[in-house]
Structures are given as structure tokens and as C-alpha cells.
Design a protein with these regions (language model features):
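A detector of single, family-specific signature residues
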Residues: 1-386
Length: 386
């Protein structure tokens, strides 16, 4: 039996993974050659590598495919990549859709491994490329900051409720205030570590400084977007980037019925969350290209929040453009019809929020309600490159 492609899948769990070795024949049939379970550990990885080597044909393309299951796939993917294997990592929703297309009614690890191997044999997919250790650490820190900020917001809400309840528990209030102080200290420590991580890489530091010349875009925003996109390494167009972030528009039309269009939100939620406050700032601080977009959409009767989401998307593409071109913000270049203005630049330091001291009193738009405790960008705190 001649075959033209080899596909090995790994359906990964916390402690073990199910593997399936399949081949695509010259008649374009997918045939399973072997299956086995391995421990999700260095010893299991070594056994898996030997198992694959015994069965593969070195003259035929081989791909190892796995699902992005939390963090559990990372060690195996990294080990195989270091060994020179072609690794493909697919999102869970894509894998699920493919399994459904095969007509499988049951679900278990063995069947999932077979379906993944079938997918790897049938389809041509982009190989997985790990991000640099610097960006990997930066992503960990920015996500930790987001989580601690959310916990801080929850504590503030609980403290507010407790202080206004009929029978106030003084000991509860005291504990909540201590917890709030702890979260605030943690946020400051994480912010300093983010700055130190960026400063440790001169090239990364220089490029992030250029990105933060956009008024309203601070260090935390830039760091989060750069880390979540792996420095835009895998993107060749703005369309790819906006789709990855979930800003692509989904139509809802059938026959004569025309439903509302909306963004898919099937993308990286960390990017969308971090861009919320910068979009408000960019409009209120009159960044011309953002302010013009906001006014054009609201002038057409669009809801204000819809316009702000459009500004978020615009900011993301601007950051992408500045990063790829390795240049700072130039107002007349990106909106020539607007008069030249005095664009904020970062000299000795970069503001966490992207808002200068002179502009802090104008950050909150008159049309927006105060939501300072609901977002991971605390306006007013400074985080500088040292």
C-alpha cells in the first residue's frame, strides 16, 4: 500500500495523551496503523518519539497534530519542535467541527485521537511556531495582571455591598480591605516585572516605545497585544489579525431576512479586553483617526459602544502597522486631511495607561459612564522603562 502523507495525533490530557498513527494512501483514504497511550511527561515524550520513529517512512511527509488544550500541550509541542518535527496545533473549536463533519456520534479520547490524525492527514495546515521565551514570559505576566485586576474588581464590589448592607460585618469589611490591599500590591509588582521583562530586550523595548506613541495606548496595552500575537510573527495582513482578535464581522442573513451584523468574538478575548479603555481614551483625547471614525459611525445612528468597538479595531491595526514598519505614530501620515497636531511621545518613560499627566482630567468621555474598576488599565499609575 502506497501512502503520500503520515499523520500522528496526540489527544492530550493532564496526565496522559492518546496517540494515533494514520497514513493517507494514494487513493486518498486515511488508514489507521497504530494507537497507544503515553504519559504526559518527559519519559512519555521519549517513548512517543521512539514509537513514531519505528513506524514512520522517512521519505514521506509526517505531521504531528494536537489540540490546544490549556497549557497541557505545550511541553510535548515544544519537545517535538526542538527535535525537528512538523507540529500542528489546532484550536478546540476547529477540531470539534471536524469531528462533527465525520459524523461521529460518540466522544472519547481514543476517537478524538483518531479524528485528529484523520484531520492531519487530510488537510494542509500551518506548522506551529513557539514564541520566544521573552514573549512567553510577557504573556504570562500580562495574563496574571488581568486575572488579579479582575479579582480586585470583585473584591471592590463585595466591599461596596458589605458597606451598604443592613447588618454590616465589621470583620468582613476588614478582611476585604486587606485583600484589596494585597491585590493592589500584587498589581504593582506585576507591572514592575512587565517593565523589567521588556527592558531586558532592547529591540522589544524600542519597538514597544514606538507603539506607545499613539495617544491613549500605554505600556500594558502594547505589552499585552504584542505578547498575545507573538510579536505579530504569524500575521501577514490586518484581516488575519482582526479575525484572530475576534473583530471580524459576522453576517446574519437568509432569504429576505436580514439580521444584525456583529463581531464574531471568536478570537483572543485578552486583546479585546485590553483595548476597551484605550479606545475610550483615544476618542476623548481627540486622536484624529479614532475621533473621526467614532463621529462618523455615531453620526450614522450607530450605538456609541458599536463605535467604540470600531475604534478598538482601528487601534489594533494601527499598532500592527507601527510594529511592522518599526516607526512611531505620525498623525499627518495616517490622516492627512487633519491638521498637524502635537502627538505625545515617550521620552524617559512610558505611561501604563498611555495618557499624559496633562490629559488625565480629560480621559473619561462625557458620553461614557465611569468604569475605571472594570478594566485592567488603571489610569494614573506610571510604569517606566528604566
Amino acid at each position: 500500500m502506497k501512502f503520500i502523507k503520515q499523520s500522528v495525533s496526540a489527544d492530550i490530557a493532564k496526565d496522559k495523551f492518546d496517540a494515533c498513527f494514520s497514513v493517507l494512501t494514494s487513493e486518498h483514504r486515511v488508514v489507521v496503523k497504530a494507537t497507544r497511550k503515553f504519559a504526559n511527561s518527559p519519559k512519555g515524550f521519549a517513548e512517543f518519539a521512539q514509537w513514531v520513529s519505528k513506524r514512520e517512512d522517512s521519505q514521506v511527509e509526517l505531521v504531528v497534530i494536537m489540540e490546544a488544550t490549556g497549557v497541557y500541550y505545550e511541553n510535548l509541542a515544544w519537545t517535538l519542535h526542538q527535535a525537528g518535527r512538523k507540529v500542528v496545533v489546532v484550536l478546540p473549536n476547529r477540531a470539534k467541527q471536524y469531528v462533527q463533519s465525520l459524523g461521529h456520534k460518540s466522544k472519547n479520547d481514543r476517537l478524538d485521537a483518531r479524528a485528529l490524525a484523520h484531520m492531519g492527514a487530510e488537510r494542509d495546515m500551518e506548522p506551529w511556531r513557539p514564541m520566544s521565551q521573552q514573549l512567553f514570559l510577557l504573556r504570562k505576566l500580562t495574563r496574571e495582571h488581568e486575572q488579579v485586576q479582575q479579582m480586585r474588581t470583585e473584591v471592590i464590589s463585595r466591599l461596596h455591598a458589605e458597606c451598604h448592607s443592613m447588618l454590616q460585618g465589621k470583620s468582613t469589611v476588614r478582611r476585604l480591605r486587606k485583600t484589596l490591599q494585597l491585590h493592589e500590591a500584587q498589581l504593582q509588582a506585576i507591572q514592575l516585572e512587565i517593565a523589567e521583562t521588556i527592558q531586558a530586550d532592547p529591540l522589544l523595548s524600542d519597538k514597544i516605545k514606538k507603539v506607545t506613541t499613539i495617544k491613549g495606548v500605554g505600556l500594558l496595552t502594547a505589552a499585552t497585544i504584542v505578547a498575545e500575537t507573538s510579536g505579530f510573527a504569524l500575521f501577514t495582513s490586518q484581516k488575519q489579525l482582526t479575525s484572530y482578535a475576534g473583530y471580524d464581522v459576522v453576517e446574519n442573513q437568509s432569504g429576505k431576512r436580514s439580521g444584525k451584523e456583529k463581531i464574531s468574538k471568536q478570537g483572543n478575548s485578552h486583546i479585546r479586553r485590553i483595548l476597551h479603555m484605550p479606545a475610550l481614551n483615544a476618542v476623548s483625547l481627540n486622536v484624529p483617526v479614532c475621533r473621526a471614525l467614532y463621529e462618523r459611525l455615531t453620526g450614522k445612528g450607530k450605538k456609541k459602544m458599536v463605535a467604540y468597538v470600531a475604534v478598538q479595531k482601528k487601534l489594533l491595526t494601527l499598532i500592527y502597522t507601527l510594529w511592522k514598519k518599526d516607526e512611531g505614530w505620525q498623525q499627518d501620515h495616517y490622516m492627512r486631511q487633519e491638521p498637524k497636531g502635537d502627538i505625545q511621545s515617550l521620552e524617559a518613560g512610558a505611561s501604563l495607561s498611555g495618557v499624559s499627566a496633562a490629559d488625565k482630567n480629560t480621559v473619561a468621555p462625557a458620553v461614557a459612564r465611569a468604569t475605571q474598576d472594570e478594566h485592567p488599565v488603571p489610569v494614573g499609575q506610571e510604569l517606566s522603562f528604566r
